[in-house]
């Protein structure tokens, strides 16, 4: 599958590395002024891992969204609402329609106390149905090959089963849940 990872910090870079490792076609997006993206373009590595050459790097959000069947969002939780507003202002909401949106961040919106799935619904409406990827783990452990279990949670059981099948591997065994 074609997977775009939005956010090229430690976890976003890991999600791109992991998706490529299990056979997916991956594009990793970062903002034009991102020091993380600059480092990845220069060395194809950060302090935790080296990206395979087949992962494409971009600072063009349209390109990343257009490319993807699955969009993994791994940005700071407090930046989610402004990022979604930016997408809508640029007319890019239609590029998310019909795609799987996976939130890989934790926490609540600090000023409202709202869950991140609620923030997505408020900003994008009911046309996009996000799921969340959560669980314990450290990038450095995964890169060393230490396996773990994680959860993908959402409302649609069939979609969750499908995502578990697409993303599970000997390194990460996924389970699904409905507790958002």
Go through the PLM ranges and name each one.
Residues 1-51, 55-59, 63:
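NAD(P)+-binding Rossmann beta1-loop-alpha1 motif at the extreme N-terminus of oxidoreductases
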Residues 49-56, 97, 126-129, 170-172:
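A short helix-to-beta-strand connector/capping loop
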Residues 63-65, 70-147, 160-164:
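Rossmann-like NAD(P)(H) cofactor-binding subdomain of soluble oxidoreductases
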Residues 136-144, 168-180:
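Conserved Rossmann-fold dehydrogenase catalytic segment
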Residues 147-174:
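Conserved anion/nucleotide-ligand pocket segment
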């Amino acid at each position: 599958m074609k997977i775009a990872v939005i956010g090229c910090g430690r976890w976003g870079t890991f999600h791109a590395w992991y998706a490529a490792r299990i056979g997916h076609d991956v594009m990793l997006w970062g903002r034009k002024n991102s020091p993380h993206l600059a480092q990845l373009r220069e060395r194809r590595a950060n302090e935790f891992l080296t990206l395979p050459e087949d992962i494409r790097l971009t600072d063009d959000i349209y390109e990343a969204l257009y490319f993807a069947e699955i969009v993994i969002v791994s940005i700071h939780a407090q930046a989610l609402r402004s990022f979604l507003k930016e997408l809508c202002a640029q007319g890019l909401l239609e590029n998310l329609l019909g795609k799987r949106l996976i939130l890989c961040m934790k926490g609540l919106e600090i000023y409202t106390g709202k869950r991140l799935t609620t923030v997505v619904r408020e900003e994008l409406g009911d046309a996009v149905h996000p799921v969340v990827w959560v669980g314990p783990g450290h990038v450095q452990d995964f890169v060393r090959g230490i396996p773990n279990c994680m959860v993908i949670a959402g409302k649609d059981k069939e979609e969750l089963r499908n995502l578990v099948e697409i993303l599970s591997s000997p390194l990460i065994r996924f389970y699904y849940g409905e507790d958002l």
